[in-house]
Amino acid sequence: LDAQLGLLERINLMTKRLEGMVAVITGASSGIGAGTVHRFVEEGASVVAADIQEQAGEALAAEFGESVVFIRTDVTQEEQVAAAVDLAVEKFGRLDCMFNNAGIVGVVGPIADTPTEDWDTTIAILLKGVFLGCKHAARVMIPQGSGSIISTSSTAGVLGGLGSHGYTAAKHGVIGLAKSVASELSEHGVRSNAIAPGNTVTAMTATVTTGDHEKLEETAEGMASRSMLGIAGQPEDIAAAAAYLASNDARLVNGHVLVVDGGQTTSGGNNRFIKSGSGMLREAGKWDRY
């Protein structure tokens, strides 16, 4: 019996890798962000869920009681990102993980037809938002002497042709920023890494591929048909990667891009995603979130 209890205790420790840790997750109200909130809480973390989608964010926080607090956050506004970080410290006493995940897909289509203002919006959310998250996480983590900064890139940040021009440029930039931050902050005990999801079933990708954010099953079938493994990525897959990078299991992982794509990028990807979605995205609305 004692041996069995000891085994159960070890298993519990393995599944509670984030026990006592505090995280800020942007883009937390849906998709990858919401999946990561669930995973982090399951592994023992307290979470500040930051998102511009207020109603969904408050509903998410209500599921977890005191373990999750929501704050409305537009990641293009520095004072709002700073407030999310400050809330983590005020509410939970520290900040162990900053997950820069908020995003949009931007306008899909030929570069000659891309409105400059839409380009600016895409870059502001996807790249400036990550910069602000890194900046204010560093403000807390440097004196703390520890921390993990995780930023969501994409397979579009590894290859071209898998997203809009603004999206692709920003996601390449996220990888560069993650590496640059890693090289600066490592001496302070702070790690910085990026995750590059492949095709992942969310409301945003459903909008791009089907024109309807609710057609998740149809989206999954299409993604599975294009996957080397024959399966579609789910938010939980990216959440698992984030939990690993946030944990002490990844203590030597720094400046890394963790590609979670079922092998898509090993074969050069494909450009059907951007071409098939362009018309439908314009009709459905271009600012759907992760």
State where each predicted segment sits:
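Short C-terminal tail/terminal secondary-structure segment
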Residues: N12-T15, V105-V108, N254-Y290
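Conserved glycine-rich cofactor-binding loop
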Residues: V22, S29-S30
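C-terminal substrate-recognition "lid" of short-chain dehydrogenase/reductases
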Residues: I25, F92, F131-C134, I142, ...
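Substrate-binding pocket helix/loop in short-chain dehydrogenase/reductase
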Residues: G109-I111, D118-I123, M223
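Active-site helix of classical SDR
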Residues: C134, A170, A178
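Alpha-helical segment proximal to the catalytic Tyr-Lys
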Residues: R139, S183-E187, R251
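Residue(s) in the substrate-gating loop at a strand-loop-helix junction
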Residues: S154
